[in-house]
Structure formats: structure tokens, C-alpha cells
Amino acid sequence: TGIHLSGTPVGVGISLGKAIILHPGTPEEPPRESSNPPEEELQDFHSALEHTINDTIKLVEKISGDVGPEEAAIFHVHLMFLEDQHFQEKIQNYILEGNSVSWSIYETIEEYLSAFSEIDDPYLSEKGADLKDVGYRLLHFLGHELLAETQKEGILVIEELLPGDM
């Protein structure tokens, strides 16, 4: 007598065990105002950007080696977002207006997601999930914890598992 859960498996095969339910850490909107000068906020952004790009490159190498280059292709899309000049400039402009780096990233991601949601195209909907993952990972490098880590053994149950959570 138990609960039957169904979803999209990440692993192969059938699993029986205790469900470990993680609630995704969709971030709340960070504070808009910053107590730091824009120059410091820009420095924090560039540092988070560099860390996220390097981390993404490592993920591409790991996934390519472990699973295959086709499965790693999603992270190339992440790199495209991270290296996109317009994306970076939008965040930097918010920072230069006196906003916090966290809010600037959050707001930029929200604006992009809103634009993607208005387009009736399944491919672009998937890109929205990729962009959300990129934003969450940038925020993570700024110190925001977005997904609870667990050392428990069992079957991970989560509403949405983004590629960068792997």
C-alpha cells in the first residue's frame, strides 16, 4: 500500500524505494536596491558570469564523456545565452541604474521568459527552461541557494529538474 507516482525518468530502468521530495527553489524576487556601488555589483556579475561559463563548460565535458555529445548539446545553448552580448548588456544596464546584481539577473530572466511565453512554439518554450536554468545558476554563484541538497538515499521527486541541477 503506497502511493504511485509517475513522471519523466532521468535514469534508466524501474526503481522502487523511498521518495525524496525536493521542492525546487524558485527564487523569490531579490531586493532591487543595492547598498554597494554599481562598480562592485558589476564586478560580482562578471565573476558570477565567469564561474557559470566555466561550470557549464565542465558540464559539457562531463556529460559528453559520461553520456554522449548529443546529450551535452543542451549546455551549448546555455553557453550561447551566457555569452550573448544583449543578455549581458541588459543585466549590466540594470546594475548601472543602481539595482542589485541579483535583481538585475532575476529581472532580465523574467523579461526573457515573458517574451518566450508569448510565442506559440514548443522549441522556444524549451529554450525558456534553459534560460531559467542559466539564471538560477548565475544566482547560485552569487550565493542564492535554489535547490535543496540532500544526502538521503531514495528516488528523487521534483516538479522540474533543470539540466544544470544534474
Describe these PLM feature segments.
Residues 1-166:
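Non-catalytic, soluble scaffold/interaction modules
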